[in-house]
Amino acid sequence: MESFHGTTILSVRRGEQVAMGGDGQVTLGHIVVKASARKVRRLYREQVLAGFAGATADAFTLFERFESKLEKHQGHLVRAAVELTRDWRTDRVLRRLEAMLAVADRSASLIITGNGDVLEPEYGIVAIGSGGAYAQAAARAMLQHTEQSPADIVKRSLEIAGDLCIYTNQSHTIETLE
């Protein structure tokens, strides 16, 4: 059986501002089954942004686990991410999940990989999913050569990724923290 997959999630940080956005397309094999999915959410008292790429059911499992770790560690993003990956590596069920998370708060942006790794990317840009490389390239250029806000950079970068990646559409959800 084929799994649900394909998306673009992008987070851009500039100074005290961070924005995260994602497209809304969900595919099953080569068929679009939903065009307006919400893959970026606010967690822990609206203070953390999180987006997912990968198998939808697996991503929701990770969201729930990550949110419980945030509660346990009073919103401390890095500690919650490390705790989640520790569980991920030791739990047989979690190890089989096929999803990635992009998470950000006012001070840090992280990628939590399907291998149970926590990565802090360079340039204040997090990009995951099938269109992630396109969105990341666009965002990096705009971040370096314009004064646009993170939300504007995310919006335009997702549009570019949607033009190039068949698993990414033009229906976007964008959240910001200031």
Swiss-Prot record:
GO terms for biological process: proteolysis involved in protein catabolic process. It is found in: Cytoplasm. Its EC number is 3.4.25.2. It holds the Pfam family Proteasome. Keywords: Allosteric enzyme, Cytoplasm, Hydrolase, Metal-binding, Protease, Sodium, Threonine protease. It catalyses: ATP-dependent cleavage of peptide bonds with broad specificity. InterPro entries: ATP-dep_Prtase_HsIV_su, Ntn_hydrolases_N, Proteasome_sua/b, Proteasome_suB-type. Na(+) binds at residues 162, 165, 168. It comes from the Bacteria. The active site is at residue 7. GO terms for molecular function: metal ion binding; threonine-type endopeptidase activity. Allosterically activated by HslU binding. One of its GO terms (cellular component) is HslUV protease complex. A double ring-shaped homohexamer of HslV is capped on each side by a ring-shaped HslU homohexamer. The assembly of the HslU/HslV complex is dependent on binding of ATP. Belongs to the peptidase T1B family. HslV subfamily. Protease subunit of a proteasome-like degradation complex believed to be a general protein degrading machinery. HAMAP family: HslV (MF_00248). This is ATP-dependent protease subunit HslV. It comes from Leptothrix cholodnii (strain ATCC 51168 / LMG 8142 / SP-6). The gene is hslV.
